[in-house]
Amino acid sequence: MKSRMHSTAAATPRQPRGLRNGGLARALRWLPALALLHGGAALASESCASPDERCAFVSALLQQREGYGAKATGGLGGRFIEVTSDQDSGPGTLRAALAQAKKGPTWIRFASDMTIVLDKQLRVPSNTTIDGRGRRVALIDDGLGVYGSQNVILTHLTIDGRLNRLTQAVNVANGSRDVWVDHLDLSRMSDRLLNVKNGSTDVTISWTKFHNSNKVMLLNNITSKNLFENYDRDAIARVTLHHNYFFNTVQRNPRGQFGTFHLFNNLLENWDFYGMSFSLEAKALVEGNIFNNDAKRQCVEPEFFPTVEGVKVNYCRYIPEAARRSALDNGASDEGAYQNLKAQNGYTRDYKAFLRLKDNLYLGDAKPVLQDYRPEAAPTPPYCYGYERPTAELADRIRKYAGNTSGDTPLPAARAGTGCAP
């Protein structure tokens, strides 16, 4: 079957004859949208002709946007395409839908639960939403590449690499901007689970579960022997991470270089080497996050993680000491290379990050490592956001709702930030 574009107009049920108050009719008209939001089988064509803000399940998703990526609208105002095949390629597949999405704004949905084993990475063009709500959709062995694309939303998907090849679950690169990654479940990639790099900016990553992987996330990536060669290109990066769950990982939760980063209300739990890492004049506000680890816990790593260098590595032996290491010391990840190259390249920039830490919670054997350093250079978010004080109850909520879970997650009632209305 071919991918098909939804063209059925939104149907508002007529009031039954003899029903004077219209209450039952008004209730019934919203059932398709409500079923979709809460994991039911309703499809877009049952409630909306096109993905615009009059469509209840479209507007419900867009209301969850926060942070630097909040301007992303994906396929809003375009057309629906429904994926009907679970094959890697051919008619009705997700790959075919993404090829069609190059023609204009597209909101992609799925006709049924699907497990799609990929032969190679999928490329996501500009003005695209991939929306797995209401279905259980899993991409296996490879993931999604967002390269030079603008205005992209990825929500409610599982991506499992099974450690089968050196690739990423989500790679945002090459000047991409206005990207929102929401409610994904990402695991077992031999390279990284998520990158934001190479001049990409205005990205929000929210309510996503990162687990069972080694090198989890890079926010910018130094690819030159001259550490600051691409500083002007990459320092424009602005990334928000909130309400994400990093569980049973090894390191880089995340690792940030250059750029402006806001991390709030994330849960890091059971890392095997270290939690976060910042260096090379990254500017980061780290607030309201929860760090939890147990020095005596059992390691759940595979026998080894494959690496780009071809080295087989395992980090289980580090757990007793790593449990305390909620982060590497400021700049530690790049200090050695910086000192070796400083004279040759005449570095005047700092190898440390500019940090402001606020209201973070450390549980179990986890200990604070990072401290304020030139905090006046750290960002003051220009937007309004749903901030919650870090508590054990918040940790439980993140464990429950982060990942490819059913339905949307309501924003916290409490708001913070300079962008809030007076």
Regions found by a protein language model. Name each.
Residues 39-40:
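N-terminal signal peptide c-region/cleavage motif recognized by signal peptidases
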Residues 143-145, 169-171, 193, 216-218, ...:
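Structural detector of coil-to-beta-strand junctions
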Residues 127, 132-135, 150-161, 176-190, ...:
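Right-handed parallel beta-helix
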Residues 25-33:
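Sec-dependent signal peptide recognition
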Residues 95-103, 115-129, 137-155, 161-176:
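Extracellular beta-strand-rich solenoid/capping regions of secreted or surface-exposed proteins
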Residues 47, 51-72, 76-79, 98-100, ...:
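Long, contiguous C-terminal flanking segments immediately downstream of a protein's structured core
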